[in-house]
């Protein structure tokens, strides 16, 4: 698969990254280099290799699954810069 300048421009737009027209060829080349590396990774034989999520084997400690109300609301809200009616109060961020 090869990325041309128009596809690179589309990817930049979708990622909300402003890219000048004169930088599009370099961006397309970077994308092609990344895709080439991914194609190399696809050639690696991983048959029989267990998937890893960590470089060190870990087992999480188990505990009884007990439903509680937590009883921590007042302690948690004391750390809040602004709490109202038992909830965190934050500035509006979406119009």
From Swiss-Prot:
Q: Does the keyword Phosphoprotein apply?
A: no
Task: Name the reaction it catalyses.
Answer: L-glutamyl-tRNA(Gln) + L-glutamine + ATP + H2O = L-glutaminyl-tRNA(Gln) + L-glutamate + ADP + phosphate + H(+); L-aspartyl-tRNA(Asn) + L-glutamine + ATP + H2O = L-asparaginyl-tRNA(Asn) + L-glutamate + ADP + phosphate + 2 H(+)
The subunit field of the Swiss-Prot or TrEMBL record says: Heterotrimer of A, B and C subunits.
GO terms assigned for molecular function: asparaginyl-tRNA synthase (glutamine-hydrolyzing) activity; ATP binding; glutaminyl-tRNA synthase (glutamine-hydrolyzing) activity
UniProt-listed InterPro entries? Asp/Glu-ADT_sf_sub_c, GatC
Could you list this entry's UniProt keywords, alphabetically sorted.
Answer: ATP-binding, Ligase, Nucleotide-binding, Protein biosynthesis
Recite the lineage of the species.
Answer: Bacteria, Pseudomonadati, Pseudomonadota, Alphaproteobacteria, Rhodobacterales
**Per its database record, what is this protein's job?**
Allows the formation of correctly charged Asn-tRNA(Asn) or Gln-tRNA(Gln) through the transamidation of misacylated Asp-tRNA(Asn) or Glu-tRNA(Gln) in organisms which lack either or both of asparaginyl-tRNA or glutaminyl-tRNA synthetases. The reaction takes place in the presence of glutamine and ATP through an activated phospho-Asp-tRNA(Asn) or phospho-Glu-tRNA(Gln).
Q: What is the protein name for this chain? A: Aspartyl/glutamyl-tRNA(Asn/Gln) amidotransferase subunit C
UniProt EC number? 6.3.5.-
Organism, as annotated: Jannaschia sp. (strain CCS1)
Biological processes, Gene Ontology terms? glutaminyl-tRNAGln biosynthesis via transamidation; regulation of translational fidelity; translation
Family indicated by similarity: Belongs to the GatC family.
Which EC class, in a word? ligase
């Amino acid at each position: 698969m090869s990325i041309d300048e128009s596809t690179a421009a589309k990817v930049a737009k979708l990622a909300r990254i402003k890219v000048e027209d004169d930088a599009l060829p370099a961006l397309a080349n970077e994308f092609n280099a990344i895709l080439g590396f991914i194609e190399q990774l696809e050639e690696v034989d991983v048959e029989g290799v267990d998937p890893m999520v960590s470089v060190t084997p870990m087992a999480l400690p188990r505990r009884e699954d007990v439903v509680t109300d937590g009883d921590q609301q007042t302690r948690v809200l004391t750390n809040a810069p602004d709490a109202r009616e038992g909830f965190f109060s934050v500035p509006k961020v979406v119009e």
